[in-house]
Amino acid sequence: RPKRGDIVVFRYPKNETIHYVKRAVATAGDLVAIKDKHLLLHPKEGNEFVKANYPKENIVEVGDKLWVVNPYSKEHPGIHNDENVVDNGLNPSELFNMSPIVVPEDETFMMGDNRDHSNDSRFWGTVNYKYIVGTPWFIYFSWDDNKEIRWDRVLKSVETLEKTVDFEKLKKIEHQEGIY
């Protein structure tokens, strides 16, 4: 079973002949939400687990729960949002905000690292473990939205695709009071 943060190959629940590769951002029993394009996670282990395992600057308190904001961004700097994708009514609202949900038993919540250009659990729900195929070793083939081959990604390991981000910018994310 995938752990939080793992990159996973799975069969698309709406069409089992299609394979997807996404990051498991929440597992059974976790609470997950999106606020202003930021992933929020309240692990099933609870508040003490959050305090013991995540940096204080990434934790916000809402009611009686501690939430981790963008829990994988520092460890996996390839996770990013596109600053050109804005909430102007033309883009899907799920990119920007999603009310908290509990991930059901035997399921996981998947998100692509290219957050604003990913067809993932925000749009079609959690993925049952029966659809999990495994972990990717390398990129066999890759193309963009225009069906152009991305030669710079072909035959690269998943780890080599991680790119550097400005960690100071991540620290400056303003946390608003409350999730919804």
What are these regions (language model features)?
Residues R1-Y180:
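Soluble "head" domains of membrane/secretory-pathway proteins
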